[in-house]
Every structure is written in C-alpha cells, then in structure tokens.
Swiss-Prot record:
Zn(2+) 1 binds at H56, H58, D148, D301. It comes from Lactobacillus gasseri (strain ATCC 33323 / DSM 20243 / BCRC 14619 / CIP 102991 / JCM 1131 / KCTC 3163 / NCIMB 11718 / NCTC 13722 / AM63). Its EC number is 3.5.2.3. Disulfide bonds: none annotated. Belongs to the metallo-dependent hydrolases superfamily. DHOase family. Class I DHOase subfamily. This is Dihydroorotase. Its cofactor is Zn(2+). The active site is at D301. Keywords: Hydrolase, Metal-binding, Pyrimidine biosynthesis, Zinc. It catalyses: (S)-dihydroorotate + H2O = N-carbamoyl-L-aspartate + H(+). One of its GO terms (molecular function) is dihydroorotase activity.
C-alpha cells in the first residue's frame, strides 16, 4: 500500500520546500505537490526530514544488556528521528573475528528497528596492540574501525593500523586520548575541577594524540575520523590539517556544544562524560568549527548506563551520556529557534546528509526518489518537556531531563514502515 506524507515542510538537498512525499514499498516514489495515495500522513505544521544519521552509538549488546540492548537502543534512535546508526564495538565479546562480526551484523539486522552499521575494532580487544584481520572483518560486514572509549596508546600500533585500514579502504575513527595525560581525571581542568575538588583532565590528553595521528594520517593517506572533538586546539589542528590536504574528518557531540563545565551545578554523575565538558572558549570554537566546515558532522555518542552507575558522585560514576532521544530537540531549540546560530538547513545537514556522505553510507540521509523511505517527522512549533518516563532507552543518564524543548519527533519511518509514533508505547 502506498503512503503519502502531505502538507509538511520537507528538507531536501539542502533546502526547505513545501511538498508531499510519496512512498511505495521500501522506497520514496516521488516528491512534489498534489500527490495522493491510499494512506495519508498529515504533516501540517511539521518538518519532514530524511531519517537522521548517527555514526556514534553504544548499544552494550552483547555483554552489558542491563544498560542497553540492540532493540532498546535502536528504538531510542527511532524516537530521536534517527534511522541509520553506527554501533561501536565495545561489547563483550569484541567483534574482532569474521565469525563474531557476522554474528553482530545479523543480530543488528534481526533485533534493530533502524539500520545499524557495525564498527570493527582497531585492535583486538580495544586495548592491546594486536591488529585484527581488517580484510576479513570488512568482508564480514564491518563498515569502519574504532576503539571508541580507548585511545590507541602507541604510535607504532596506530601507524600499522592506518596502513592496513588504507589498504582495505576502511575509515579509522578514533577516540583521541593519551592515557598518561588523562591520568584518571574526572572533569575538565578548569572551574568545575576546582569547585568540586575533582581530578582534572587536561586538554592535552586529547590534543596531543590528535596531533600525532594527523601526522600518521598524512603519511599513510588513510581516512582518519576523530570522534567527539571537544577543545579549541583540536579544532585548530583539524583546520590546519585540512588546509594541508590531510584526509581527516571529525564530529562533535551535542553535549559539548550545548554545555560547558560551568554548567555543572554540583557533584552529579549525569555530567560525567569522556571527553569531559570543556570551557566556554572551547565551546565557542566548536561552534565556529561547525559553521566553517572544520567539523563535518554531529554524532551523539549515545552511551547509556544503569541509574546505579551514575549515582554516588562523579568519582564513582561511569563516563557517558545518552543522546539519541534528545539530540535533535535540544540542538534545534538552542541553536536554531532561540540563539539563531545555525539555520534549520545547516542543522539537518549536520545530522543527516553530511554524516552519510563522510562515511559513504548509501541511501541514507537524503529524501530522493529511488532512495530508502527513511523519514523523520518533527514538531518544531510546540514545546515539550524531556521526561525520563518517555525514554525508549534503558539509559536515562542525561542532564537535559526537565528541559522544555521544540522539535519532538512525531513519527519515524524506516523502509516505509512506521517504527516510532508519538504517543504510542
């Protein structure tokens, strides 16, 4: 049965247009005016967007399914308007063999309600210097490589990894962190560390590893992608590298542009994340980086934890913040609706077509005839409160609970099928 989404404002190819979207089967059939079908979805006053693309999520499955699993994580993505995600490999066991990778890919397809692309690890268990068989992992379904949560500590290991990744046309996506400089820190070296008397994290833990890796990327020619850049110096390093022709891309997480360490009101585990919230100068530089193209995309780093793991103060709390269900609404409210730092078109590009393009994900992040019918419909005119009770994720570890925001997801379709609808369980 054909479906038409009528009366909405459609984001297509960088523009907002008044149009209808006709869906037949799993594909978009047409975008235009006065389209008709047996089933009509009225999007009057709504934004009709390509399904958003999040290249950085943690689903904890297998190994830590009390925090999240593929089903709940993908349902959370759908509730946030995301229809394509990249799942990090920090699960147990790490998918470091073709057999384990094939199993992960099959589980993602079977249990997930959105399209899930699976990362393979850069090193065998994400902390050793042993490099797995990238060719075999790619053949088994790995779409990129990452040790997210861990930096690759030795330059030699990263150099070899980049060479092998280049040979196999795989992206290296890194969590840039020198553990000797991170030194068991908790919050950014700044106001919160002093106020709360917590171990500080120097920005050098991030920036020195980025500088090292950029030189290695220049030598090898690999596509080097930096996860969740968080400092002014990181942005400057990437800007310089791009000017020199190094094949580098990077992402920023919503919380690093929405919050700073000055926003941490007390010793609250919901504000503990890695990289930590930085200062206002860093935040401003991240926004400039988004606007001038130094930062290529926004990715949530959705990192759910059990409530018990975020209680008892920041020293004992786990690192991480959920993001799938709050990203679009919080970003739209602050940067488009209120502060007018970004246009709606710019925000949507950073959350849809740009991440798909950077990672070479075909059929994602665009609304065009012949492409997958992956669509998100947002209510951008009315405010709604972020409530724990509404979350699909098992993790409610976010400091944004209680905020009133515009941009709630009304409906999400994947391959033409409704996978989320506001007001339904």
């Amino acid at each position: 049965m054909a479906t038409v989404i009528k009366n909405g404002t459609v984001y297509q190819n960088g523009r907002l247009i008044k149009a209808d979207v006709l869906i037949e089967g799993k594909k978009i059939k047409a975008i235009g005016t006065d389209l008709d079908a047996e089933k009509i979805i009225d999007a009057q006053g709504m934004l009709v967007s390509p399904g958003l693309v999040d290249v950085h999520v943690h689903y904890r499955d297998p190994g830590q399914t009390y925090k999240e699993d593929i089903k709940t994580g993908s349902e959370a993505a759908a509730r946030g308007g995301f229809t394509t995600v990249g799942a990090m490999p920090n699960v147990t066991p790490v998918p470091n063999t073709p057999e384990l990778m094939k199993k992960m890919v099959e589980e993602n397809k079977h249990k997930g309600v959105v399209h899930i692309f699976q990362y393979g690890p850069i090193t065998n268990d994400e902390t050793t210097d042993i490099i797995p068989d990238y060719a075999a992992l790619k053949k088994a379904g790995a779409f990129a490589l990452s040790n997210d949560g861990h930096g690759v500590q030795t330059a030699q290991t990263m150099y070899l990894a980049m060479q092998k990744a280049k040979e196999n046309n795989l992206i290296i996506a890194t969590h840039a962190q020198d553990d000797s400089l991170f030194n068991k820190g908790i919050v950014n070296e700044g106001v919160a560390a002093k106020k709360l008397d917590l171990p500080p994290v120097t920005e050098l833990a991030e920036t020195t590893q980025i500088a090292r890796d950029l030189l290695l990327a220049q030598k090898t020619g690999v596509h080097y992608h930096i996860c969740h850049v968080s400092t002014k110096t990181s942005v400057e390093l990437v800007r310089l590298a791009k000017a020199r022709g190094i094949n580098v891309t990077c992402e920023v997480a919503p919380h690093h542009i929405l919050l700073t360490d000055s926003d941490i009101p007390k010793d609250n585990g919901y504000f503990k994340m890695n990289p930590p919230l930085r200062n206002k100068e860093d935040q401003a530089a991240l926004l400039v980086g988004l606007l001038d193209g130094t930062i290529d995309l926004i990715a949530t780093d959705h990192a759910p934890h059990a409530k018990s793991e975020k209680q008892g103060g920041m020293k004992n709390a786990a690192f991480g913040i959920t993001g799938s269900e709050t990203a679009f609404s919080t970003l739209y409210t602050k940067f488009v609706k209120e502060e007018k730092v970004l246009s709606l078109e710019q925000l949507l590009a950073l959350l849809s077509d740009k991440p798909a393009k950077v990672f070479g994900i075909e059929n994602a992040g665009v609304l065009e005839p012949g492409k997958n019918a992956d669509v998100a419909i947002f209510d951008i005119e009315h405010k709604n409160e972020i409530k724990e009770a509404d979350f699909k994720s098992k993790g409610v570890n976010t400091p944004f609970t209680g905020q009133k925001v515009y941009g709630e997801t009304v409906m999400t379709l994947v391959d033409g099928e409704v996978v989320y609808q506001r007001g339904t369980k």
